[in-house]
Amino acid sequence: MSRLSWGYREHNGPIHWKEFFPIADGDQQSPIEIKTKEVKYDSSLRPLSIKYDPSSAKIISNSGHSFNVDFDDTENKSVLRGGPLTGSYRLRQVHLHWGSADDHGSEHIVDGVSYAAELHVVHWNSDKYPSFVEAAHEPDGLAVLGVFLQIGEPNSQLQKITDTLDSIKEKGKQTRFTNFDLLSLLPPSWDYWTYPGSLTVPPLLESVTWIVLKQPINISSQQLAKFRSLLCTAEGEAAAFLVSNHRPPQPLKGRKVRASFH
């Protein structure tokens, strides 16, 4: 494995990441297991304020690690405010983590229970920093909204994504993707847990305020299977499916998880 060739297979998966990214063993790594008995309700946490403009979605691509929807983040068109955050955090990207079967796949775990998948909505602190790249190195630089997915009815909001997957099957492929109503993908309740953590993929930077929504959204088993049909290999390489792309929970190391709800 080299710095660039990390992944989720046996030879380059999460247990190997620390060889090139020593922060993998750091004090504020993500994901974690949320143990609800140890979580403290914090009355100072505000409700989330979310404004997402569907026209700010630009491209969907296959990174070899997930699909990514990238958003135009040149101005505050789509922003996350409130909650545990100070100032405005601009929407940058959305991606998904899943497992090889429907009974696991989320990165965060709640009281020992895994969900089928977990959507990550990545934002950066545009009030304090000039770009995502610079914000990613600062302790208050990023905010990631985590949304759990459970198996249930087909999700019509996810269909727009699953319909494009055939055109980005191989790593490195991308296609235009706009008018994506991300707000309608979120669950009705925005109750959340929050804690200081990291990116869950290399470079694993400890710059993330995590906001994990308690209420899951639905995905059908058939929709989820579409994601496993993506390849983690590029055109011309020996094809390998991206059957699983989640990092296991990391030690809490004294961090406190707070809840916005009783």
UniProtKB/Swiss-Prot annotation:
- Annotated active site: 65 (proton donor/acceptor)
Domain of life according to the entry: Eukaryota
Enzyme class at the top of the EC tree = lyase
As cofactor, the record names: Zn(2+)
**Entry's Gene Ontology molecular function annotations:** carbonate dehydratase activity; zinc ion binding
Q: Name one GO cellular component term.
A: intracellular membrane-bounded organelle
Q: How is its activity regulated?
A: Inhibited by acetazolamide.
**Locate the Alpha-carbonic anhydrase domain: which residues?**
4-261
What EC number(s) does the entry state?
A: 4.2.1.1
Keywords of the record, alphabetical order, are:
Lyase, Metal-binding, Zinc
Which CDD domains does this UniProt record tie to the protein?
alpha_CA_I_II_III_XIII
Q: Where does Zn(2+) bind?
A: 95, 97, 120
The record's family statement is: Belongs to the alpha-carbonic anhydrase family.
Q: What does this protein do?
A: Reversible hydration of carbon dioxide.
**Name of this protein:** Carbonic anhydrase 13
What organism, scientifically named, is this protein from? Homo sapiens (Human)
Q: Which gene encodes it?
A: CA13
